[in-house]
């Protein structure tokens, strides 16, 4: 920043966008290979290269922001807009899944027995594990807000405690969801009900895993004193993402579990 006359961060050439794109190609190709030929080699390679890319790319960003001071208020504003646009794109993703669900359920075809849930499908009880999952995610929304307020007030210990509680609740949610999938009386191949249920809830579950990873990174960064009350966009972005995951689950619960059953 010493030799610059502007507040913008001119990033150095980086290999990570290229390796990230290649890992995404490997993952999608690997997923196809897994589904059709039961081979997980490409998928494993794709996931490994993706994890390595993410680690090294985020390491570079942390170095530039925390240790080199490149993330000025103008740069942070750009990152905020980027995160907002990313969350909007995710909203549109889920809109597609809800559209597929309501398109199929509001006008069930004769092939489905003219009813919803389709003939032969035994839906999950919305007042059992799904309701517990809802309360777990709502509680995690409260604890992430507590963490944010603690950070703004400079209370590091409370922030770490609240963040740990949020991560624990996220992991608990994932385990509950996995057990629900394991015990579900229908599969993803059980027609349009199975496919819409597992794709929508599974995609949300993937977001919970991503959000939990995001928060774990924030937890370890805070252990190393990376965040201050006026410079903590990494944590703020994680909190926004977590609230988004919360809200999507409420819509999933009301639509697919409660109304759809």
Swiss-Prot record:
Gene Ontology biological-process annotations:
mitochondrial electron transport, cytochrome c to oxygen; respiratory chain complex IV assembly
| Segment forming the signal sequence | none
* Record localization: Mitochondrion inner membrane
What is the annotated quaternary arrangement, including any partners?
Component of the cytochrome c oxidase (complex IV, CIV), a multisubunit enzyme composed of 14 subunits. The complex is composed of a catalytic core of 3 subunits MT-CO1, MT-CO2 and MT-CO3, encoded in the mitochondrial DNA, and 11 supernumerary subunits COX4I, COX5A, COX5B, COX6A, COX6B, COX6C, COX7A, COX7B, COX7C, COX8 and NDUFA4, which are encoded in the nuclear genome.
Q: What is its EC number?
A: 7.1.1.9
Q: What is this protein called?
A: Cytochrome c oxidase subunit 3
Q: Which residues lie on this side of the membrane: Mitochondrial intermembrane?
A: 35-40, 106-128, 184-190, 257-261
Q: Which organism is it from?
A: Antidorcas marsupialis (Springbok)
Principal place of residence: mitochondrion
Which InterPro entries does its entry note?
A: Cyt_c/ubiquinol_Oxase_su3 (IPR024791), Cyt_c_oxase_su3_dom (IPR033945), Cyt_c_oxidase-like_su3 (IPR000298), Cyt_c_oxidase_su3-like_sf (IPR035973), Cyt_c_oxidase_su3_a-hlx (IPR013833)
Give the record's membrane topology: Multi-pass membrane protein
Which Pfam families does this chain map to?
Answer: COX3 (PF00510)
Q: Which family does it belong to?
A: Belongs to the cytochrome c oxidase subunit 3 family.
Gene3D superfamilies xrefs: 1.10.287.70, Cytochrome c oxidase, subunit III, four-helix bundle
For this record, the Gene Ontology CC terms, alphabetical, are: mitochondrial inner membrane; respiratory chain complex IV
Keyword annotations from UniProtKB, A to Z = Membrane, Mitochondrion, Mitochondrion inner membrane, Translocase, Transmembrane, Transmembrane helix
The Gene Ontology terms for molecular function here are: cytochrome-c oxidase activity
Q: Mind telling me which SUPFAM superfamilies this protein's record contains?
A: Cytochrome c oxidase subunit III-like
- What does the function comment of this entry state? Component of the cytochrome c oxidase, the last enzyme in the mitochondrial electron transport chain which drives oxidative phosphorylation. The respiratory chain contains 3 multisubunit complexes succinate dehydrogenase (complex II, CII), ubiquinol-cytochrome c oxidoreductase (cytochrome b-c1 complex, complex III, CIII) and cytochrome c oxidase (complex IV, CIV), that cooperate to transfer electrons derived from NADH and succinate to molecular oxygen, creating an electrochemical gradient over the inner membrane that drives transmembrane transport and the ATP synthase.
Q: Which residues cross the membrane?
A: 16-34, 41-66, 73-105, 129-152, 156-183, 191-223, 233-256
List, alphabetically, the CDD domains matched.
Cyt_c_Oxidase_III
Which sequence ranges are listed under topological domain Mitochondrial matrix? Answer: 1-15, 67-72, 153-155, 224-232
Task: Give the catalytic activity.
Answer: 4 Fe(II)-[cytochrome c] + O2 + 8 H(+)(in) = 4 Fe(III)-[cytochrome c] + 2 H2O + 4 H(+)(out)
Class of this enzyme: translocase
């Amino acid at each position: 920043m010493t030799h610059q006359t502007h507040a913008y961060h001119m990033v150095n050439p980086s290999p990570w966008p290229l390796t990230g794109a290649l890992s995404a190609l490997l993952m999608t190709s690997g997923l196809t290979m897994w589904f059709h030929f039961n081979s997980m080699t490409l998928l494993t390679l794709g996931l490994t290269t993706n994890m390595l890319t993410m680690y090294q790319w985020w390491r570079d960003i942390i170095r530039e922001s925390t240790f080199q001071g490149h993330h000025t208020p103008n740069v942070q504003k750009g990152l905020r807009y980027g995160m907002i646009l990313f969350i909007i794109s995710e909203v549109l993703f889920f809109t597609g899944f809800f559209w597929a669900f309501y398109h199929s359920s509001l006008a069930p075809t004769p092939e489905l027995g003219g009813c919803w849930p389709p003939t032969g499908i035994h839906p999950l009880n919305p007042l059992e594990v799904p309701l517990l999952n809802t309360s777990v995610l709502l509680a995690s929304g409260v604890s992430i807000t507590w963490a944010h307020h603690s950070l703004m007030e400079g209370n590091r210990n409370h922030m770490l405690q609240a963040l740990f509680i949020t991560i624990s609740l996220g992991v608990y949610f994932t385990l509950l969801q996995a057990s629900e999938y394991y015990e579900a009386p229908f599969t993803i191949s059980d027609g349009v009900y199975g496919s819409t249920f597992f794709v929508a809830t599974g995609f949300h579950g993937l977001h919970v895993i991503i959000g939990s990873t995001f928060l774990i990174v924030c937890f370890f960064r805070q252990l190393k004193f990376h965040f201050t009350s006026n410079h903590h966009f990494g944590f703020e972005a994680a909190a926004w993402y977590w609230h988004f995951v919360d809200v999507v689950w409420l819509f999933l619960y009301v639509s697919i579990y409660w109304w759809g059953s």
